[in-house]
From Swiss-Prot:
Part of the biosynthetic pathway for all classes of flavonoids, a large class of secondary plant metabolites, many of which are brightly colored. It catalyses: a chalcone = a flavanone. This is Chalcone--flavanone isomerase. Its EC number is 5.5.1.6. Belongs to the chalcone isomerase family. It comes from Clitoria ternatea.
């Protein structure tokens, strides 16, 4: 499989996502799978709220390529199953959400929580355990404010935990042990109704290129 280290950085509305990072709660370096803006069409203007970068552990490449190598960027972008495989795959993921506009922790966590609950209810898997995980998720953000340029950092473990860190000095990592929550936070970004179509397109394009490069290298 081709190495991802030849990948370039991605700039999203003056936020630069480097090609590789070491997440705060992992010992390994992850590669930038893709990045994009999250915004809303408000009347005749597209208002950008956050820039989202999605990093994947090296283990993601052989896992995803086994099924998706040979597919075009467009085919991957349109495939709900492809993004489900990224969300549920047995490898670590790291997401950096950087503010373009200021947000309060309450504004951010309530919107993410709504999206997570909607995903679970659509799948018929919303239980008391998930409700408790959502309560803890909201409480982590309760007293936070995020000025432009500040970031929320999520680390998703395949074992079922979600690490949450804030970019400000002295921030510690809070870990929530709930597999469905860890997956739903990422799914809310890049799933069927994900808030960042641009990040989905970026992931599809960059991963498609890596799959092709891996195929060529192996011949």
């Amino acid at each position: 499989m081709a190495t991802p280290w030849s990948l370039t950085a991605v700039e999203v509305d003056n936020v630069v996502f480097p090609p590789a990072v070491k997440p705060p709660s992992s010992a390994d370096t992850f590669f930038l799978g893709g990045a994009g803006v999250r915004g809303l069409q408000i009347e005749d203007k597209f208002v950008k709220f956050t820039a989202i970068g999605i990093y994947l552990h090296d283990d993601a490449l052989p896992f995803l390529a086994a099924k998706w190598n040979g597919k075009s960027d467009h085919e991957l972008t349109e495939s709900v199953e492809f993004f489900r495989d990224i969300v549920t795959g047995p490898f670590e993921k790291f997401m950096q959400v950087t503010m373009i506009l200021p947000l309060t922790g309450q504004q951010y966590s309530e919107k993410v929580s709504e999206n997570c609950v909607a995903i679970w209810k659509s799948l018929g898997i919303y239980t008391d355990a998930e409700a408790k995980a959502i309560d803890k998720f909201v409480s982590v953000f309760k007293d936070e404010t995020f000025p432009p340029g500040s970031s929320i950092l999520f680390t998703v473990s395949p074992k079922g935990s979600l690490g949450i860190t804030f970019s400000k000095d002295g921030s510690t990592t809070t870990v929530i042990e709930n597999k469905l929550l860890s997956e739903a936070v990422l799914e809310s970004m890049i799933g069927k109704h994900g808030v960042s179509p641009a990040a989905k397109q970026s992931l599809a394009s960059r991963l498609s290129g890596l799959f092709k490069a891996g195929g060529d290298t192996d011949k």
